[in-house]
Amino acid sequence: MIWVAVVITMLLFILVAKPTGIYLEKAFQGSKKLDKVFGPFEKLIFKITGVKEYNQTWKQYALSLVLLNGFMIVVVYFVFRLQGVLPLNPANIKGMEPTLAFNTAISFMADTNLQHYSGENGLSYLSQLIGITFLMFAAPATTLALVMAFIRGLAGKELGNFFVDFTRALTRVFLPIAFMAALVFVALGVPQTLDGVVTAQTIDGAKQSILRGPVASFVSIKELGNNGGGFFGANSTHPFENPGQMSNILQMMLMMLLPTALPFTYGRMVGNKKQGRILFVSLFMVFLLGFITITTSELNGNPVLNGMGIEHVQGSTEGKEVRFGTVFSSLYATVTTAAETGAVNTMHDTLTPIGGLVPLVNMMLNTVYGGVGAGFVNIIMYAIIAVFISGLMVGRTPEFLGKKIEGKEMKLIAVTILFHPLLILGFSALALSTHLGTEAISNSGFHGLTQVVYEYTSSAANNGSGFEGLADNTPFWNITTGLVMFLGRYFSLITMLAVAASLKEKTVVPETVGTFRTDNSLFGGIFIGTIVIVGALTFFPMLVLGPIAEFLTLK
C-alpha cells in the first residue's frame, strides 16, 4: 500500500507540472483574463510605489534586484534586533544577538531559511509575520521574476522590468496559491491563530506549555516558495506543522510545483516545447535515482544494528516520525533537497551514510530541479555546457536556441560553475582548520566532516536544511554561513542574467542538417552526463572522505 501511495504522489508531481508551467507563461507574458483580474490591483501598486513599466537592461534589472533585496535585509535585521520592545510578543522574547540577526535576515532573503535559532523561543509573532513570512514571499518572488527575464533573454526578447515581474510573481502566483494552500492546511489540522501559549494538563497531572500561532499561513508559503524554515524548531516533524500523511503529501507537492513547472514555461516562451519536456524528463530520472538510492539505504537499516541481529523490518527508524514511516521520510528528504527547500520531516543527521549522501549530492548539484527560479538558471547553465562539450567533440561552433555560444558566455559560465564548489569547499576548509569551527562538531571522524560540509553546502545551495548535530549558533558560523548564503544566492543569478543578455543580442543561426538538436533523447542523455561529470565529480573527493568512508567503516 505504501508504494501505491508513493507512485500516486509521483504522478501528482508530473500531472500538475505542465498546467502550472502554462499558467506561469500566461501570468508573466500577458493574458487578457489574468490582466483583467490582477491588472487593477497591480496598477494601484505601481502608482503608489512610483514604478514605471519600461524595459530594463540586464544591469538595471540586476541592480534593482540587489538594491530591493538589500533594503529588505536591513529592515528585517532591525525587526529581529528590536523584537523585544515591539508589539505582538506575548512570550516576551528578547531581541536577537547581532550575528544571529545578520544570519537570519540574509538566510530568509536568500530563500535559504537556515535557522540557527529555534522558532518556539527565538522569534516573536511580529518577527514571524513581518520578518520571516514577508521574506518568504519576497525571496521566491525575486528569483521567479529573474528567471522570467532570463528566459526572455534566451528567447531574444527584451528582459522586462524587475519591479513589474516581482509584483506579478506576488499577486499572480504566490499570494493566491499560498492562500488556498493555507486553507487546506487549516482543514488538515494545522493551527492558525495569533493567540499566545496554551497551558495544558498532561495525563500524569503536570502542566505543559504549548505554543501555537499563525502556522498554516507560514507552512503554505514555506513550501510553495521553496523556503523551508520552520515555525517550530522541529520543522515539519512537528505535528502542528505537519499533522499527518495528507499534509505531508501536500507539502511535497507545493515544494515541487514551481521547479517542475519551469521547464514547461521555458519551452513555451522560447518556442521549443519539446526541449522543455526533455529537460523535465531528464531531471525527473535523476530525481528518481536519488529517491531509489536513499530509500534502499534507509530500508536496509543501520549496518551496526543489523550485525547485532536486531530486527529492522521498518528499516532505519532513527530520527524519523512513525506517522510518516521510512519510505515517505526518504521521499520527503529527496524532494526537499532536490527542490532546494530545506524543510525536513526527518532529522537528516540520523540518516544512514548513503541516505545522507543523496540530500548532500542534490544540494551540490543544485539543479535537480533546484529552487524557484534559481534552480532553473542552473539547469540552463548545465544545458549550455552540454551543448558546448558536444560542439567541441564534433568540431562545430556550439549553438543553443539558434545562438552561437562563444567565449564571453563560456567565461561567465565557467566562473559561475566554479564559484559554487569554491564557496562550499573553501569555507569548509576554513571551519575545519580553526577551533572556532571544529568546536561546533558533535561527531568525530567521517560524520563530523560531513556535518561541516553539509552546513556550507546547504548555505551555498540556498537550501537551509542541516545535520543538526552541529552547534552552529556562534558568531563564527553565523557570519560565515551568512556570507556563503549571500554570495551563493546573488553571484550566479547576476552572471547568468548577463549570459542571457549576451545571447539576446545575437542573431539566430539558420538550422542545418549538422545542427545539434537540443530537443531529443540524445541531448537528454548528454545533459544528464554533464550534470554527473561536471557537477558530481567536482565534489567526489569530499564525498569519499565523508559519507562513503563512513559507510565503509560501518559495513
UniProtKB/Swiss-Prot annotation:
Q: Is Glycosyltransferase among this UniProt entry's keywords? A: no
User: What transmembrane ranges does the database entry give?
Assistant: 2-22, 60-80, 130-150, 173-193, 246-266, 278-298, 374-394, 412-432, 483-503, 525-545
Q: Which UniProt keywords apply?
A: Cell membrane, Ion transport, Membrane, Potassium, Potassium transport, Transmembrane, Transmembrane helix, Transport
The region annotated as signal peptide is none
Q: Does the keyword Cell membrane apply?
A: yes
Topological relation to the membrane, as annotated: Multi-pass membrane protein
Q: Which GO terms describe its molecular function?
A: P-type potassium transmembrane transporter activity; potassium ion binding
Pfam families under this entry? KdpA (PF03814)
* Gene Ontology cellular-component annotations: plasma membrane
Q: Which domain of life is it from?
A: Bacteria
The subcellular location is: Cell membrane
Q: Which InterPro entries match?
A: KdpA
Q: What is known about what this protein does?
A: Part of the high-affinity ATP-driven potassium transport (or Kdp) system, which catalyzes the hydrolysis of ATP coupled with the electrogenic transport of potassium into the cytoplasm. This subunit binds the extracellular potassium ions and delivers the ions to the membrane domain of KdpB through an intramembrane tunnel.
The annotated subunit structure for this chain is:
The system is composed of three essential subunits: KdpA, KdpB and KdpC.
To which protein family does this belong? Belongs to the KdpA family.
Q: What is this protein called?
A: Potassium-transporting ATPase potassium-binding subunit
Natural source organism: Bacillus cereus (strain ATCC 10987 / NRS 248)
